[in-house]
């Protein structure tokens, strides 16, 4: 999920058996399954509606960076297929070879052979996305430039900030998108009290940890896209449901979400940025 330039502890974490259980569909938990069919689905389809007219009908090309075990991309392909939108190709990348292998198995298990042929998963780091993809796909940079309609990253962009490589990642996203293409980023909200370590820090029960210090603000998530000339369509806080929540907690929080949004939206769990590449690309 995160960058290969992060400390060795993260490489160990995201190449472990526990990572496979956490980031694949059968064992990931009820919360993420609920979100993929509700909160996340809603923002995905809203972002896709911002594509140039006729794009969905002519065949979408999708890319998810930091895709983990692939469950998000696989589910999105299924949703689009059921909704009548054609998917020409879907590509997932992650720095963890273990999770990339798991994603390939997941696609074979959950998708028909015809749909599975349209998916591919590759080992690639967020901050060197284009060059790693070129290497993995045995292709040329020119073939990837301006080739994707929709690029998304879920709970992964903060690791680029941690490595101070967020501009490199955003620049590669810009290059990969077609003019008018859309990027969507969902990640942890630094203002949320419900992240355990962050809560302990705010209550002065422990000193700030490296993870506390590395969760960007909404403005910081947005900044690299603004700097590179994207049109920022949405940048906001949303979602009160943890990925790991059980069924009961999930439905309680879902029912409370309208009230929580009304009184404390900035404290919700996720930051959302939706940015579109201009039809006429600015100088960068």
Predicted feature descriptions by range:
Residues 1-56, 75, 184-205:
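Conserved class I S-adenosyl-L-methionine
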Residues 66-70:
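Class I SAM-dependent methyltransferase "Motif I" SAM/SAH-binding loop
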Residues 71-132:
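Class I SAM-dependent methyltransferase SAM/SAH-binding core
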Residues 152:
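A conserved beta-strand element that flanks and buttresses the S-adenosyl-L-methionine
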Residues 167-179:
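A short glycine-rich, Lys/Arg-flanked "PGG" loop and its adjoining helix->strand segment in the class I
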Residues 204-219:
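Acceptor-substrate binding/catalytic loop of class I
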Residues 234-284:
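A C-terminal cap/extension of S-adenosyl-L-methionine-dependent methyltransferases
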């Amino acid at each position: 999920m995160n960058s290969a330039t992060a400390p060795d502890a993260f490489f160990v974490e995201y190449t472990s058996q526990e990572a496979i259980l956490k980031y694949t569909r059968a064992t990931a938990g009820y919360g993420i399954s609920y979100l993929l069919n509700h909160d996340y689905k809603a923002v995905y389809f809203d972002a896709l509606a911002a594509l140039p007219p006729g794009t969905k009908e002519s065949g979408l090309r999708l890319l998810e960076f930091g895709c983990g075990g692939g469950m998000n991309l696989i589910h999105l392909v299924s949703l689009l297929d059921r909704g009548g939108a054609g998917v020409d190709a879907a590509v997932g990348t992650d720095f963890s070879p273990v999770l990339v292998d798991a994603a390939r198995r997941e696609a074979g298990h959950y998708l028909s052979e015809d749909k599975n042929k349209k998916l591919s998963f590759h080992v690639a780091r967020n901050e060197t996305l284009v060059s790693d993809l070129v290497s993995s796909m045995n292709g040329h940079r020119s073939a990837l430039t301006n080739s994707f309609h929709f690029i998304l990253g879920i709970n992964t962009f903060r690791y680029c900030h941690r490595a101070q490589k967020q501009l490199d990642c955003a620049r590669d996203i810009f290059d990969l998108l077609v003019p008018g293409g859309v990027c969507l980023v969902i990640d942890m909200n630094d203002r949320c009290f419900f992240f355990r370590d962050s809560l302990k820090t705010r209550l002065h029960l422990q000193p700030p940890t490296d993870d506390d210090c590395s969760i960007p603000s909404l403005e910081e998530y947005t900044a690299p896209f603004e700097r590179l000339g994207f049109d920022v369509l949405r940048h906001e806080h949303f979602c009160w449901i943890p990925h790991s929540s059980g069924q009961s907690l999930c439905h309680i929080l879902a029912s409370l979400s309208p009230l929580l949004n009304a009184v404390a939206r900035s404290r919700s769990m996720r930051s959302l940025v939706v940015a579109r590449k201009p039809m006429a690309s600015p100088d960068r």
